Amino acid sequence: MEYNPFHNGHLYHLTSARELVKPDYTIAVMSGNFCQRGEPAVIDKFARAEIALRMGVDVVLELPVVFATQDAGGFAFGAVCVLDATGVVTDVVFGSESNDIEFLQRVARILYEQPDEYQKFLHEELKKGYSFPNARKYALMRYFSMKGWNEEEVLKLEKSNDILGVEYIHSALKIGSNIRFHTIKRVGAEEKDTSFRGRFSSATAIRNLMREKRWEEVRDSLPEDSFEILMREINEGRGPVFLENMGDFLLSFFRLKNMDFFEKIHGFSEGLEKRFHVCARQTGSYRDFLECVKAKRFTFSRIRRLALFSVFEVNKEFVEKSNTKGPQYIRILGFTEKGREILSLMRKKAKLPIVTNMSLYRKVLEKTDLPVDKQLFLEQIDLDVKATNFYSMFFPSVEQRCGERDFSIHPIFLRTEM
């Protein structure tokens, strides 16, 4: 989840998920301060975790930045690995436009098994110049047609939640997880819908309302507690944070780098390093820079992710290793009194070390006897800290911009009111 911000659709998903699987506890794995579309969250991860707890989540875990800022495949892989590593998660419920779990499982199985015919179709579609998501869609349509299945079904994968759902199931197959997957029909506006649609407006639309300071419409789109905490963060100068706030810095940073620098960064290929190098010098705003880099084959989300990888100097080897070995720790962002119970069980059953107090993460690493890659553990957690330090520099209030928030803020603990 991203909860950027936590809106009525998220509350519907959470409530429906509880009704569907009747869990003893509810755990959410959430992006930190940067999200999968390559953008900053409008308020920071601690405030968003607090909202999730107030809305009924028992434990909020952080998805490490190296996964939270990847494409759908990397994002889903990190999330499923974290949930599986808790040792206590049995079911995952995700929102879906199609609400067709059998179709999503069929596609995930194709992606996992990689039949020769599918690989051939994918290669041919990529050669036509399509972006990877579109090339994969067309390759799947051809594969479905070859099998005598309804190829029009593949058009469901044009929707963001269904794409992510396929990747969740695919990731579980890759790691041999026994987690059961369920879908909840997405309600309200589509994710990319930029218009206000009342109670069930999309997160994209809500962020646009925030840009325009249309607070009454924002209030209508969020649960009461979510709106209350959002406004608290804004009034105290810790939000909202938008990508455009970072634009001048990002463009300046890119102008200082040569193509050799970009070639070492994860995700740069097909001439993108040259496009970054040239466009940074030919444009005067970050918006114009994105338009300059954009081509038929590259999505804006991909370009924004590459921009973040560049600033954080995320190299290819680090991401490849992370995508092979997965997250190396479980970071706790917050929990309720009820959540304490499941945390106690997690400490006995978890497959990865649990980091609750960030000031002690090195001791956690030294003491663990779990099979983790210690160097990768340090690299992943270092990126999380780096991302938080960078993010806080763009708080509206100068007084709030102090660094090391990962160490000064402890996990949110929500007590049950008497």
From Swiss-Prot:
Class of this enzyme: ligase
InterPro entries: Rossmann-like_a/b/a_fold, tRNA(Met)_cyd_acetate_ligase
Keyword Membrane: no
Any one of the GO CC terms: cytoplasm
Gene Ontology molecular function, alphabetical: ATP binding; ligase activity, forming carbon-nitrogen bonds; tRNA binding
Catalysed reactions listed for this entry: cytidine(34) in elongator tRNA(Met) + acetate + ATP = N(4)-acetylcytidine(34) in elongator tRNA(Met) + AMP + diphosphate
EC number per UniProt: 6.3.4.-
Signal peptide: none
Record flagged with keyword NAD: no
Location(s) in or outside the cell: Cytoplasm
Annotated keywords: ATP-binding, Cytoplasm, Ligase, Nucleotide-binding, RNA-binding, tRNA processing, tRNA-binding
Main location: cytoplasm
UniProt similarity note: Belongs to the TmcAL family.
Task of the protein: Catalyzes the formation of N(4)-acetylcytidine (ac(4)C) at the wobble position of elongator tRNA(Met), using acetate and ATP as substrates. First activates an acetate ion to form acetyladenylate (Ac-AMP) and then transfers the acetyl group to tRNA to form ac(4)C34.
NCBIfam families for the chain: PRK13670.1 (NF010191)
Name the UniProt record assigns to this protein: tRNA(Met) cytidine acetate ligase
Organism of derivation: Thermotoga maritima (strain ATCC 43589 / DSM 3109 / JCM 10099 / NBRC 100826 / MSB8)
